[in-house]
Regions:
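Hydrophobic core segments of alpha-helical transmembrane domains in multi-pass membrane transport
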Residues: 10-18, 60-70, 106-116, 143-149, ...
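Membrane-helix/interface signature in polytopic inner-membrane proteins
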Residues: 66-106
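Transmembrane helix-bundle core of multi-pass membrane transporters
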Residues: 2-75, 101-104, 127-129
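Loop-to-transmembrane alpha-helix initiation sites
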Residues: 2-4, 54-60, 102, 134-136, ...
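Transmembrane helix-loop junctions in multipass membrane proteins, especially transporters and channels
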Residues: 22-30, 73, 77, 122-129, ...
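Transmembrane alpha-helices
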Residues: 4, 63, 92, 97-120
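Transmembrane alpha-helical segments in multi-pass inner-membrane proteins
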Residues: 106-107, 113-114, 123-186
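Cytosolic-side transmembrane-helix boundaries in multi-pass membrane proteins
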Residues: 93-100, 170-207
């Protein structure tokens, strides 16, 4: 399953990176003291709304959303992604190159991970090997809340964006209520389980 392979590869690369840093790097210490221009490129603001500065990374996220929406809805590659996710066998019979589409999807995901790492490093002002660890859980939760199906064939970019907003509002509220980080992990897991259960129920009803 692509998700299992991706998760396993992540753990392998993460472990190798930690060993490399411990043996040949800075003993696992965070990299800080990043150039100010690098941080300002991401955390600075060129536009204010009613006097409130909007960080640049918000606009970068908007650009990515528009790009992905266009690719998903207006290109052949987007249609192929949907077809392969829905039913690889049927997509193959219809003339879609399933292997090529799958590789391109993973390549696109890798590019997005790189962009995210670049932005996150500048946003927090430092970087280390475990920066972004467990972000995949946030991504899964946001997508499932936004209507993306684990079995494929269902999902919209607008739904994912809505899921991100809903998830973020939930965790900001939990922080405001002084809920511990450990309990937030529990709540996040429950959100994913409940959303997946609802998704599977819808799938079984359709079947």
């Amino acid at each position: 399953h692509p998700f299992i392979v991706t998760l396993a590869t992540q753990l392998i690369v993460y472990g190798i990176l930690l060993m490399y840093i411990m043996l040949n790097g800075n003993n696992g210490q965070p990299l800080s003291g990043l150039d100010k221009s690098f941080k300002n490129f991401v955390t600075g603001s060129f536009l204010k709304i009613r006097g409130v500065p909007i960080p640049n990374y918000v606009w970068y996220a908007c650009v990515v959303v528009v790009f992905m929406w266009f690719m998903w809805n207006k290109t052949t590659f987007g249609k192929n992604m949907f077809a392969v996710g829905s039913n690889p066998e049927a997509a193959n019979v219809s003339g879609v190159n399933v292997m090529r589409t799958t590789i391109l999807v993973h390549t696109l995901a890798g590019c997005m991970y790189g962009i995210t790492g670049f932005i996150e490093s500048a946003r927090i002002g430092s970087n280390q090997a475990n920066t972004g660890l467990n972000y995949e859980c946030d991504a899964i939760a946001a997508c499932v809340i936004g209507g993306v199906s684990f079995v494929g064939g269902t999902g919209k970019i607008s739904g994912v964006v809505l899921g991100v907003f809903i998830l973020r509002i939930i965790f900001v509220a939990l922080q405001f209520l002084a809920v511990s980080q450990n309990m937030q992990y529990v709540i996040k897991g429950l959100i994913i389980l409940i959303a997946c259960a609802i998704d599977m129920r819808k799938y079984l009803v359709r079947k």
